[in-house]
């Protein structure tokens, strides 16, 4: 699996240390193991997880601005855990409402000794925003409109929303409230992955 990951990273132009690669593989192995009992993801094959979960998450890392992020609807830690491994200097709060997912996240935190993550079981509407976050990240969580509506209290004055999407979500962008501005839409290159991937970066015009 290490060879496959190394080839994928090379194709994506991403450089990681051996320690980071081993952490990513350990995470995939844990996800594969726990998935049999907890049904954390529909992806069953660990090699497929490397592409659809690991690479699909970490290609976002260069576009994240700031040091303090919250992964909303994190599920089994996607994209938060892969991002925390490739951005060890940043801190990631992993928010999910389901206990079984948060238990898995805490086990990953313990086994991989990830000191820059904080798994939290909560609904996003009830989660406090003090201090506010530099970035609010979501992957397959909600529409853009719902994301900014439910998470409006989380980013700081210079904070951003980072929404990981498949095809270009033009309809969702058109429905955004006027106080939110799309700063950029990045077409992501994910080697070995069929279909399009986009990152939508939204700025809240907070006064």
Swiss-Prot record:
Pfam families: GidB. InterPro entries: rRNA_ssu_MeTfrase_G (IPR003682), SAM-dependent_MTases_sf (IPR029063). It is found in: Cytoplasm. It is an enzyme of class 2 (transferase). PANTHER family: S-ADENOSYL-L-METHIONINE-DEPENDENT METHYLTRANSFERASES SUPERFAMILY PROTEIN (PTHR31760:SF0). NCBIfam families: rsmG_gidB (TIGR00138). This is Ribosomal RNA small subunit methyltransferase G. It comes from Shigella flexneri. The gene is rsmG.
């Amino acid at each position: 699996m290490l060879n496959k990951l190394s080839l994928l990273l090379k194709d994506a132009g991403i450089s990681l240390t051996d320690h980071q690669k081993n952490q990513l593989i350990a995470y995939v192995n844990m996800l594969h193991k726990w998935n049999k009992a907890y049904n954390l993801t529909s992806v069953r094959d660990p090699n497929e997880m490397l592409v659809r979960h690991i690479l699909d998450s970490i290609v976002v890392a260069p576009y994240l601005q700031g040091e303090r992020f919250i992964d909303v609807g994190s599920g089994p830690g996607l994209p938060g855990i892969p991002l925390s491994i490739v951005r060890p200097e940043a801190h990631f709060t992993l928010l999910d409402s389901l206990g079984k997912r948060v238990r898995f996240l805490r086990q990953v935190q313990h086994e991989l000794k990830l000191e820059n993550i904080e798994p939290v079981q909560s609904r996003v509407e009830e989660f406090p925003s003090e201090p506010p976050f530099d970035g609010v990240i979501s992957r397959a969580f909600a529409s853009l409109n719902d994301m900014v509506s439910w998470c409006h209290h989380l980013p700081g004055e210079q904070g951003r929303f980072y929404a990981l999407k498949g095809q270009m979500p033009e309809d969702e962008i058109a429905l955004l409230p006027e106080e939110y501005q799309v700063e950029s839409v990045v077409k992501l290159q994910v080697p070995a992955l069929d279909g399009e991937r986009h990152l939508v970066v939204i700025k809240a015009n907070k006064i």
